[in-house]
A protein has these predicted regions:
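Extracellular/periplasmic catalytic domains that process cell-envelope and extracellular macromolecules
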Residues: 43-47, 66-67, 94-95, 132, ...
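Charged helix-capping and loop-helix junction motifs
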Residues: 115-125, 163-166
């Protein structure tokens, strides 16, 4: 178990190390990541389950209550990158869940990763799921916009275009792999290409009304 988590953190650190703009993970972030990942490792996944997989945006919602479905399970972790999802998939894959909803990529953007690379890593994750869980329905959701006018995220400054490029690359992955693409981006973006101010208090994470928009967008795929 400890070795798996160390490998997971190493994978995230490896991406960080090669990116000139990459932030260092704080000790508290690493501790939270380990707590969350080891917790998930001990929680069973069943064939009837619906998995919400992602980063802080996913982590921030009570999905089973939001979607009115006790089989919906949250597997989001603050700060995670796409490679991090890949490295911690084993407990999910063992359970052969009915559906997996993925939303990830903005932390990769903040680490200096380009759109095409985001698409490649996401495709690796999707191929893994398809190979190990051939009956699982996969739903890939687009990255959301962010808004550095609300709060300055210096590692995201002037990188709005990478979100657009990454979404385009991931949509092509969905076409190649035959999985469902859910484009959330237009629902959250304002006329200036930024996350709508009324949906956030820090320019990146969602307030309650934002989660209601997200819920409504995926409702027909969940139920």
């Amino acid at each position: 178990m400890k070795r798996k988590i160390l490998l997971l953190i190493t994978a995230i650190a490896a991406i960080t190390a090669v990116q000139a703009q990459a932030p260092e993970r704080t000790a508290n972030q690493d501790k939270y990541y380990v707590r969350r990942a080891t917790h998930f490792d001990d929680l069973p996944v069943h064939r009837r389950d619906i998995i919400m997989l992602g980063n802080s945006l996913t982590d921030g919602a009570e999905w089973n209550e939001l979607l009115g479905n006790p089989n919906v399970k949250n597997r989001g972790i603050i700060g995670d990158i796409i490679q991090g999802l890949y490295e911690r998939m084993e407990p999910i894959l063992k359970g052969q869940p009915r559906k997996i909803f993925i939303l990830s990529g903005v932390n990769d953007v903040s680490h200096g990763v380009d759109g095409d690379s985001i698409g490649r890593v996401m495709e690796k994750l999707i191929v893994l799921i398809k190979e190990r869980c051939p009956r699982t329905e996969i739903y890939l959701q687009s990255m959301l916009p962010f808004n550095t006018d609300v709060q300055m995220w210096k590692l995201l400054k002037d990188r709005e275009h990478v979100v657009i490029d990454g979404n385009r690359a991931m949509e092509e992955v969905c076409k190649r792999q035959g999985v469902t693409w859910i484009n959330l981006y237009p629902l959250f973006v304002d006329e200036n290409g930024k996350l709508r101010e009324e949906l956030t208090n820090d320019g990146l994470h969602l307030l309650g009304p934002g989660y209601l928009i997200w819920r409504d967008a995926i409702w027909k795929y969940v139920n």
